[in-house]
Structures are given as C-alpha cells and as structure tokens.
From Swiss-Prot:
Membrane topology field: Single-pass type I membrane protein
Protein name: Receptor-like protein 42
GO biological process: defense response; regulation of defense response to fungus; regulation of defense response to oomycetes; response to molecule of fungal origin
LRR repeats: 97-121, 122-143, 146-169, 170-195, 197-219, 220-244, 246-267, 268-291, 293-316, 317-339, 341-363, 364-389, 390-411, 412-436, 438-461, 462-485, 486-505, 506-527, 528-551, 553-575, 577-598, 599-623, 626-650, 700-723, 724-747, 748-771, 773-796
GO CC annotations on file: plasma membrane
All ranges on the Cytoplasmic side of the membrane: 866-890
Positions annotated with a glycan in the UniProt record: 58, 70, 91, 109, 145, 189, 207, 243, 266, 303, 312, 351, 461, 505, 518, 574, 730, 778
Organism of derivation: Arabidopsis thaliana (Mouse-ear cress)
Coiled coil spans: none
Assembly and binders: Interacts with BcPG3.
Keywords (A to Z) from UniProt: Cell membrane, Glycoprotein, Leucine-rich repeat, Membrane, Plant defense, Receptor, Repeat, Signal, Transmembrane, Transmembrane helix
Secretion signal span: 1-21
Length: 890
C-alpha cells in the first residue's frame, strides 16, 4: 500500500474516532447489547438490507456493522464494505438515518446507480465513502448541503461533470475523486480552492484541464498529499507550489507539463516527488539530492538533459527510489554512485555515448532494482569477474545489444526477476540459470536462443513461476516445466512433437501459450483447468476435448489454425468466465453453437474457415443472443438461411460507444510474488481495410462482424444500425438481396465496409457518404444502380470497389450518369422519409420490424481476420498506486 493510501486510511480512522460515544453492532444483530439501536432504527436498517442482495457480504468482518448512539439509540455510523448488490434508489431506507455522522459503503455493487440527491438530507455527515461502488452520472448539487463533511471519498466510480458540488464543504480535510470521468477547466475561482482545510486531495485519472496548473493550488497550504496524475493539465507548474510547505507527497505524472522542474526546494517535508510522463526540460537541480526526507524521485519519460551533480553530503540522503529513464541525460553514473541508500534505480534508454560499466554501481549495497534497458553495456562488465550488488532482485537489460548470456548473473543469488528481451543472445540457456534459488520471473523474448543445456528435466526443480521465451529459435521437444510454473509462453519458436503430459501435473499453471510452433498430436484433456490456453498455428489433430466441467475457470481459448476435426464441445457451456473463443481455420464440422449465448461474458467468437453448416438464424427466427459479444468472425463456412430484421437487437454491448481510453481490454492480471503482478493483454491479427495488421490490446469497446463467404440470403438486417460500436463489417460473398439498409448511416464509427459479391439492388444510400471514419468500402459485383454518392470518404475509394454493377454511374467509375446535364436519379421514397427522420433508429422500431420494405444495400471492410492472440506482458511493481501504471512500463 502506498504512503498516500496509508495516510488516507489513517485519516478516515482518525475522523471516525471523533464520532460521539456509541455502541457497535454486527451486520446481523443491531438489536444486541446494552446500548442497542432504537426500534425505528432497527426497522430502517432491516429494510435497507432487504433492498439488496447481501450474499457476498462477509458477516465476520469486524468492520461491517452499525454504530448507535448510547443515549438516543440513533444510528450514527454505518459501514458495509463489499456487501451490497443492487440499485440504490432515491426512496431507499438509507435516507431515514438523519443522525448519521459516518457512512462507509465502499466496494459495493450498486449496478450503475446514480448518486441520489437524497444524500443531501444526511446533513450531519462528517465522513462519507462511496468508492468503488459503480456509481455513474453527475454528483448532485445537493451534496453542497453536507457542510459538516470532513472526509469525502468518491474514487473509482463512473462519475462525470465538474466539482461544483464541493461548494460550501468548507470543513473538508480529505477529498478523493480519483479514477472517475470528472472534467472541465479548473478555473482560479473554482470552489475547490476555497477548501482551505484540505490535507489530502486526489484528482488522479480524470480529465481536468487548464492552460497551467492554477496558481490557486498554492492557497491550499495545509495540503500534505496532492495528486493530479493523468489528467489534461499542460503548461508550467506555478511557483506557488512552493507555498505548500506541509506537502509530503506530490504526484503530477501523465500530464503535459512543460518548462523546468517545479520549485520544490522549500518543501522540506517532501518524501515522494512523482513527475513521470510529462515534457519537463532543462537540468535536474542538485538540491533535490539534499532534501532531508525525500525518498522517491520519479522523473522518467521527460525531456531532461545535461549532467547531474550530487553533493558529497548526499551520502546521508534518504533517497531510495530514483527513476531517470527516457531522458537525455549526460554524465550521471559517477554522481549517482554517491547515493548509497538507493534501492531502485532506473537509467533506461539514456542514449549514452559510452558503454556503462556495471561495476560503477558496486557502492550501492542496498540496491534491489536496476533498469539499464536500451543502454550500451560494457561487455566486460557482464562476465563472472565483474562486481554488481549481490542484493539485486530485479534486473532489466532489454534492448542492450547483448550477444552472450551474462555470466555475472551467477553471483546474484537474490535475483527474482530477469528481463533480457530484444537482444542478440544466441546458443542455449545455461543450466546454472535455473539453479538461482529465488528466481521467479524470466523474460527472455526476441533473441536467438536455440535450446537448453542439460536434460529435459532441467527446469523441473527451478523456482520459476513466470517464464516467457517468445520469438526465439527454440526447437525439439518442450522440456518439462517447473513444478511451480504459473505462466508459460513460448510463442513463435520451433518446438515440435506432442505437448508433454507432464503439464497435467503443474497444478499452479494458469496461462499456457504455445502458439506458432510445430506441435502435433492431440490436445491433452487435462488442460481444461487453465485460465488461458493458446495453441494457435500448430499441427494439432483430433477433436477438442469435451472435458469442461461446471465452474471451469477458462477465460480465453484459442486453437485456431490447426487440423482439428469433430464438433465444438458442448461442455464449453460450463465455462461461465469465457471471454475469448477461437477455433478458426480448422476442420470442425458442426451447426452454429447457439448454446454459447448462455455464456454471460463471451465477447469474442471466431469460427471462420471451418465446416459449420445449417441456419445462422436461431430456431425461433428471433434475435441472436450474445449480449456481450463484440467480435464475431464466422467467414468461410457453409451457414445458410436468412436473418430477421431484429437479428442484432440483443447485442447490447456493441450498441454503446465509448472513448478509446475508457474501453475495456481483454486482460488478465495476477499477483505473482510480493508486490509484483503480471498483466496479459490479447492481441489479434486482422485483414482490415484491405491490409494485414496486428491490433495489440483487443479493445472491447469496438465491435467487428465478418459473415463473408457463407450461403446467407434474404435482406440485410436493419438492426445492424444499432451497433454503434461497429468499426468493421464484412458480408461479402453471400447471396444477400434487397437494398442496403439506411440504418447503416448510424454506424458513425465504421471504418471498413464490404458488401461485395452479393445480389444487392437499388442505390447506394447517400448517408454512407457522411461516415467520416469510413476508410475502406467495397460494393462491387452486385446489382446496384444510380449515381455513386459523392461524399469524401466514398469518392476516395478505388474504381474496383464499385465495378460489376451494371447500373452504377459517377465518379470513380468512368460511366457518367445520363450525360453531364441530366438530373440525378430520383431518391427512393423510403430514403427521403429516412432523411426527414434524420435516419434515427431505435430499439423499439427494430423490434417491430422497423422499415418494412426499406431495403437498400450495405458495405464493409475485408475483416477476414486471422486472429493471432499473443500476450503482452508487463511487470508492474505497485508499491504505490502510481507504480501500478508506471513502474516498469515504458
């Protein structure tokens, strides 16, 4: 836990201790004890509990319960953490507790409730926490009635708007609104700057902006913690920041600040200075290294230059964490050697003009972490004769042009984490590496290694939990994995033979990725208990094991591009956590798996290039299920039938759009040791906009559909226009008839549209010319007629996108439309009516068959997607919350 979080927790507890004399009662028994709650209060509390699902509540949690005033019996404090699931309604019994002084409801699931204005009635509140509880929309202005508040925590919700609700909250000492969507300009006259008693202010991860950090922050001179990380502030940090003489922690990272480093020399109590990821320039003042309590400096990823000077007096410095990577610093190594108390040192990507000798760090006897990635390392200092601190636990030497395995690692018996990716290391992994007693994580991807010294059992007794060996030249049989293995990835190597059955005995294995190798044989049935199984692009045969039992934890399953046959296992329906399913490019012969609609979290379904057959429309001819599905790729099968107009109405997740930075990624995160954890992201290979590309981090706020190369017929469903998150649509090479739906003009995010090789008729809707993101469009080889719309995005398409339609005319085709002076073709009546209605499509209209007889054609990109899931692995050290995002990610 970070110092700032510890401080916040301490402050909340301190404020809670100020509540009047009271008695505490458990969640289930508010009536027990000598000072029991009044009968009306008991009734209100019981009603409040009954408004929610409380099955997740930990009734043994000593902090969950009710405090009642000993003299009046009134509820004065209520804390229910991670207990409640449901909607917090304005008529909730909660608002009957008018004597509440402390209300703590963090980590509940209020299912996207808005914060009720009724909170303003609880005007005796001194402490209020609603963090991590799913609240959305704006904070009601009635919050300004809570004039007694000393602490307010609204962090980690989906709240929007400004901070106008803090007006009149003049007693506030703690304000945390981090991890929301608050926005707007922080003006000098903002109510925020009237909160002169604030000692803790956290605005992290919002979208506040200002041409510079307001000078008025300097008026909050009681502040001890100030955090404005990851907003949209730019310009220079005002000199008034030096007025905050009580400040102990200052967080300004991930903004667009410029100019010199802020003046912090007067902040003699400062212990943490975090300025990562800005555009600060100039030199680093030597005074930073003599500040009496400063223990952590994060200046990485800026534009700092020059050398640094470390006074001799710095040997007594408390500095433990120094991050200077990705700057333009010159002579810094010898001065840094004076900072003998350093525990973490980042000097990555400094572009030094001379090689770095690791022995320069020999004086740093307490060093635990060293990152020299992207630097030029002296070859001699990597030998066994070199000396570097034996205390090292984490060593990163990526992108260092190293060609031999560093023997100096032999002496590092405390080493837990090694990163040597993107070098030129060849030969075999040395046998001694796996004998390092504390080695837990090894990342040696993108090298030239060919195998392992020793027998096939060489890894078995290693302590390694995380092993990533992607993109080497490893060949032969896969060695037996460590007994402690949690994550193993060997993507893009030359391993062959059967997948060893010894993997079945690795009970802690969560993630196995053997994609892009030469494995053959069958998939071992025992792999059904993994969280992530990736076997893409091998030579595996047989059927997929039908061994998935109830509550199987599987989240991602990819066996695409193999030689698998048989049917899709019905037991997959037991995988309630499944998000990503890919069996594309195999020989699976089955009907469409409608039963998978029961999987509540399924977001990606890839079935292309198999032998799926039969109707794609559900047996009842109603809408297709899959409310969370965003990517559906079933191209190149033998699916038949027509699709009803309301086919896509249940795709709720794809009907909403969000800004890219607010999207959710296909991601898995797991603590691996101590304060370290790994994060895995999905990536996919697309043929997109006519080009092959890799999309890293599958953003599930976007949607793509590819139904091409089947035998589908009838009209294109009007309900496609509901899928506002759709960026790519491919319906080519089918037998669709009728007109292109006008509703496609509602797809404002669409980038790629392919309707080629169908039997579509009518004109191309003019509305498609207004789609500003449409970069690729193909409607060739249909029966379209009339003039091609002249919108910018359409006229930029090649002639081949419109060929094969005898009745089409206009640019970019050579055929003119009835002569240069002839009037344009008359619009169909339905298109005129749709334009009058501004082409708005709603759910009700689709459900009753909106636009009966409104048939116009459709168009989408070549999303013949060959999905190549890989893992992007980033190690993050979360000693404070910011390190969760900055620690080792560049």
């Amino acid at each position: 836990m970070s110092k700032s979080l510890l401080r916040l927790t301490f402050l909340l507890l301190l404020l809670l201790s100020c509540v009047s004399p009271s008695s505490f009662f458990t969640f289930n028994n508010p009536a027990e004890g000598p000072g029991a709650c009044g009968p009306h209060q008991i009734q209100a509390f019981t009603q409040f509990k009954n408004e929610f699902d409380t099955r997740a509540c930990n009734h043994s949690d000593p902090w969950n319960g009710v405090w009642c005033d000993n003299s009046t019996g009134a509820v004065t404090m209520l804390q229910l953490r991670a207990c409640l699931s449901g909607t917090l309604k304005p008529n909730s019994s909660l608002f009957q507790f008018h004597h509440l002084r402390s209300l703590l409801l963090p980590h509940n699931n209020f299912t996207s409730s808005s914060i009720s204005s009724k909170f303003g009635m609880l005007n005796n509140l001194e402490v209020l926490s609603l963090s991590s509880s799913g609240f959305l929309a704006q904070v009601p202005f009635s919050f300004s009635n809570l004039s007694m508040l000393s602490a307010l925590d609204l962090s980690k919700n989906e709240l929007t708007g400004s901070l106008s609700f803090v007006r009149n909250l003049r007693k506030l000492r703690v304000l945390d609104v981090s991890y929301n969507h608050f926005s707007g300009i922080l003006n000098p006259n903002s109510s925020l700057f009237e909160l002169h008693h604030l000692i803790y202010l956290n605005l992290r991860y919002n979208n506040f902006t200002s041409s510079s950090l307001p000078y008025e922050f300097g008026n909050l001179n009681k502040l001890e913690v100030l955090d404005v990380s990851s907003n949209s502030f730019f310009g220079q940090v005002p000199p008034t920041i030096s007025n905050l003489t009580q400040l102990t922690e200052l967080y300004l990272p991930l903004n667009d600040f410029t100019g010199s480093l802020p003046l912090v020399q007067n902040l003699t109590k400062l212990s943490i200075l975090h300025l990562f990821g800005n555009h600060f320039s100039g030199t680093i003042p030597s005074s930073l290294f003599t500040m009496p309590f400063l223990s952590s400096i994060y200046l990485n990823k800026n534009n700092l230059s020059g050398s640094i000077e470390v006074p001799n007096s710095s040997s007594s410095s408390r500095l433990e964490h120094l991050y200077l990577g990705k700057n333009h610093l010159g002579k810094i190594l010898e001065p840094i050697a004076k900072l003998v108390n350093l525990k973490e040192l980042d000097l990555s990507f400094l572009n030094t003009s001379h090689p770095i000798d690791l022995s320069l760090f020999s004086s740093l006897k307490s060093l635990l972490l060293l990152d020299l990635s992207g630097d030029w390392i002296s070859k001699a200092s990597l030998t066994l004769d070199s000396y570097i601190p034996s205390t090292l636990e984490v060593l990163r030497l990526e992108h260092c042009d190293i060609s031999e395995f560093p023997n100096v690692f032999k002496t590092l018996h405390n080493l837990e984490y090694i990163a040597l990716s993107n070098n030129r290391i060849s030969g075999k992994f040395p046998e001694w590496l796996w004998s390092l007693p504390r080695l837990s994580s090894v990342f040696i991807t993108d090298n030239l290694l060919t195998g392992f010294e020793g027998s096939s059992e060489v890894l078995v007794n290693s302590s390694v939990q995380i092993l990533s060996l992607d993109t080497n030249s490893l060949e032969g049989a896969l060695p037996h994995l460590p007994l402690s293995i949690n994550y193993f990835s060997a993507i893009d190597n030359r391993f062959g033979g059967d997948i060893p059955l010894s993997i079945c005995n690795r009970s802690s294995l969560d993630v196995l990725d053997l994609s892009y190798n030469n494995f053959s044989g069958q998939i071992p049935p025992c792999l059904s208990n993994l969280l992530y199984l990736k076997l893409r692009k091998n030579n595996l045969e047989g059927s997929i094991p039908d061994k998935y039992y109830v509550d199987t934890p599987l989240r991602s399953f990819d066996v695409g591009y193999n030689r698998l046959t048989g049917k899709l296992p019905r037991s997959l329906i037991n995988c309630s956590a499944l998000q990503f399913l890919s069996v594309d490019h195999n020989g699976i012969k089955d009907t469409f798996p409608f039963y998978l609609k029961a999987l509540p979290k399924l977001q990606v379904l890839l079935l292309s290039s198999n032998e799926f057959y039969g109707p794609l429309s559900p047996p009842n001819q109603g809408p297709l299920g899959f409310p969370e599905l965003r990517i559906l790729e079933i191209a190149g099968n033998k699916l038949t039938g027509s699709l009803p107009p309301d086919f896509f109405v249940n795709w709720k997740a794809s009907s909403h759009t969000m800004n890219e930075d607010l999207g959710l990624y296909m991601v898995y995160s797991k603590v691996i040791f101590g304060n370290y954890h790994l994060t895995y992201y999905e990536t996919i290979d697309l043929r997109y906009k006519g080009l092959s590309m890799e999309q890293e981090n599958v953003l599930t706020s976007s949607a793509t559909i590819d139904l091409s190369g089947n035998r589908l017929e009838g009209e294109i469903p009007e309900s496609l226009g509901l899928l506002k998150a759709l960026i790519a649509l491919n319906l080519s090479n089918n037998a669709f008839t009728g007109h292109i739906p006008l509703s496609l003009a509602n797809l404002k995010k669409i980038e790629s549209l392919d309707l080629s090789s169908n039997q579509l008729s009518g004109t191309i809707p003019n509305g498609l010319g207004t789609l500003s993101f449409l970069a690729y469009m193909n409607v060739s080889h249909n029966q379209l007629n009339g003039e091609i719309p002249q919108g910018t995005q359409i006229t930029g398409q090649p002639k081949s996108s419109f060929e094969g339609n005898a009745g089409l005319c206009g640019f970019p085709l050579q055929e003119s439309c009835f002569g240069t002076n002839a009037p344009p073709a008359q619009k169909p009546k339905e298109e005129e009516e749709a334009e009058e209605d501004e082409q708005e499509l709603n759910w009700k209209a689709v459900a009753i068959g909106y636009g009966v007889g409104v048939l116009l054609g459709l168009a989408i990109a070549q999303l013949i997607a060959s999905y190549k899931p890989e893992w992007l692995v980033c190690l993050v050290k979360s000693r404070n919350p910011l390190r969760s995002f900055f620690g080792f990610e560049y």
